[in-house]
């Protein structure tokens, strides 16, 4: 809507105005911005500048208890001094025990620490389960498998805090969904993937004309379904590298035919984490980055161009069955399995992480219980006295 362009700096994705941005809201009287807690300072400033000349009303809708934009301590939308504010009190996404848990985590009524193992907390509107780790994993596998069989991936997801935990859980989730085939192929037809970064034109086998933007074929955080997979040997010399830059490997990866709604793309994928091909690719990227830095601002420009072309030549997609809490914000799922690293996050964002993770669930929340102090256990039993006693 704002006619922005994507600028990629290191591993960050930034929005910048274009020549069309200033007039983007010219004919609009009202613009509604949902999930406003994720609007960063730069995007907020651009939106306000665009709206001012045309007196366009901007209505921001969001929850200040959710996570702020990456790299910011708080959501700038809620710090605006001249805004007219209103609070909505009725929760409609979830009810019952899920709502109770989300509310207690949000207002501090329950500590954001690993819960105790408890009997099922449930009523006719939903449930919360606190189980030993093995039982949690078994139920997660069953739920993911059932969601796949029903062709409803939003029926169950695993949420975690760190990418390290995500990479550890992804193989477990893929085996649950795809069985033995998961260990034979890094990507399978029918698999639901999510873009972990914007996919740029060099990664598209169809060229940039099929994408969502001139240089970007698929935005970040977009889910796609894999239709077909083809092995591909990618010679990095095709991207301007030469033996003068060091060893130039051939990267064994795959091209995936994917669809997202009416959009169909053929993308060259990054090799999976931990594979020989991924280590070789990462090694070349690290070497180019260091060479560019050593060459200085003027002499390093050509090296940086090769670096960015190579980086953009591989799409960063991963299985959508396991998501980080940050990536899940704005979505909702039936059953949510919360990994324990969410409760071990830095204290400054732990409450927001726990609240966002739990509030993604429409029906059920599954937590790993155990090791809680008597004080923590009493807090949980008191908070859910009615639904525990009805179990």
Language-model region placement:
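Loop/turn-to-beta-strand initiation segments
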Residues: 27-30, 54-60, 364-366
């Amino acid at each position: 809507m704002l006619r922005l362009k994507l600028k990629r700096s290191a591993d960050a994705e930034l929005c910048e105005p274009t020549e069309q941005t200033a007039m983007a809201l010219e004919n609009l009287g009202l613009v509604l911005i949902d999930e406003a807690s994720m609007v960063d300072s730069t995007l907020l400033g651009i939106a306000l500048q665009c709206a001012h000349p045309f007196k366009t009303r901007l209505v921001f809708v969001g929850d200040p208890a959710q996570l702020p934009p990456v790299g910011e301590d708080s959501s700038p939308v809620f710090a605006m001094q001249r805004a007219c504010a209103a609070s909505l009190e009725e929760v409609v996404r979830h009810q019952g025990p899920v709502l109770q848990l989300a509310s207690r985590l949000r207002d501090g009524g329950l500590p954001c620490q690993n819960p105790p193992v408890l009997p099922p907390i449930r009523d006719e509107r939903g449930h919360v389960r606190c189980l030993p780790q093995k039982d949690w994993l078994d139920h997660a596998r069953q739920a993911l498998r059932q969601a796949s069989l029903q062709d409803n991936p939003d029926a169950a997801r695993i949420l975690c805090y760190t990418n390290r935990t995500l990479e550890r859980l992804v193989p477990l989730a893929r085996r649950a969904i795809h069985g033995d085939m998961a260990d034979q192929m890094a990507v399978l037809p029918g698999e639901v993937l999510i873009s972990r970064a914007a996919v740029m034109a060099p990664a598209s086998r169809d060229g940039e004309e099929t994408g969502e933007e001139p240089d970007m074929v698929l935005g970040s955080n977009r889910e796609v379904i894999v239709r077909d997979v083809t092995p591909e040997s990618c010679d990095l010399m095709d991207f301007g590298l030469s033996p003068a830059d060091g060893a130039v490997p051939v990267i064994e990866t795959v091209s995936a035919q994917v669809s997202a709604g009416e959009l169909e793309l053929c993308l060259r994928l990054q090799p999976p984490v931990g594979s020989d091909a991924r280590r070789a690719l990462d090694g070349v990227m690290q070497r180019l980055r260091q060479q560019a830095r050593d060459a200085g601002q003027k002499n390093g420009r050509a090296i940086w161009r090769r670096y960015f072309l190579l980086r953009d030549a591989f799409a960063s997609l991963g299985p959508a069955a396991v998501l980080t809490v940050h990536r899940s914000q704005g979505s909702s799922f039936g059953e949510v399995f919360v990994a324990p690293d969410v409760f071990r996050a830095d204290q400054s964002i732990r409450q927001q992480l726990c609240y966002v993770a739990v509030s993604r669930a429409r029906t059920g929340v599954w937590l790993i219980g155990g090791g809680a102090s008597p004080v923590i256990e009493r807090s949980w039993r008191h908070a859910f006295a009615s639904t525990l006693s009805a179990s």
